[in-house]
């Protein structure tokens, strides 16, 4: 399932995520198998881009890499771009972080 969520592109690795805001803490949840997205919980509210900034900062800490929101800046369903990691690296990190694996 995780291989369907993490994709390679010309620019780098894309990850499909589903964001829940106003959470108790920032964390990676489980894989939403129906939507084929990784659930991310963020403490910030989606006001004036605060949640998007928090997502980028949180994921930068996990992947130790630059993170960009590739699509979905105004949606809870987003795709993030990691330009300088391999798919294998990203999958390995996610498998450590995801609660349902």
UniProtKB/Swiss-Prot annotation:
Q: One Pfam family this chain carries? A: DUF167
Q: Name one GO cellular component term.
A: cytoplasm
Query: So where does this one cross the membrane?
Result: none
Extract the InterPro entries matched here.
Answer: DUF167, YggU-like_sf
Q: Which family does it belong to?
A: Belongs to the UPF0235 family.
Top-level taxonomic group: Archaea
According to UniProt, the name of this protein is UPF0235 protein MmarC7_0309
Looking up SUPFAM superfamilies in the UniProt record yields:
YggU-like
